[in-house]
Amino acid sequence: MVLVSMLMLTLEIHAASAATSGNVSSTSEMDWTPVMDAIIQVESKGDPKAKSGNSVGVMQITPILVAECNNILKRKKSKKRYTLADRYNVAKSKEMFLLIQSVYNPLNSIERAIRSWNGGNHYKKKRTQRYFEKVMKLLKK
């Protein structure tokens, strides 16, 4: 766990350094695939039909998250919009994850991505600890 923490700190320092030098790595340049795949395993074990309350699909996306993605797209003057049915589509679920990261995680913090996916943008570290550890365990494999 110490090694993982050091790795994440190093990534965050590098991202912060890049941001101050004007070389900000955009979310599109960050390879979020391993993080998304680990989240998918924790959330649904890869079942695109998974459902728990209002959360559905491989990434257990809520209607509120779909609405937030559409608000972001609207602010970006994009005509694209997501539907509630898109939560069952693996590729579109990953697109929504990436869109959220691009806005709410500009430094591409892996820890922030994992914790906020579980606890929202104003997550509490203590409440997201078990989830974070589950995802990190899969990332280490």
What feature does the model see in each segment?
Residues 1-12:
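Bacterial N-terminal signal peptides
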Residues 17-141:
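Catalytic glycan-binding domains that act on GlcNAc-containing polysaccharides
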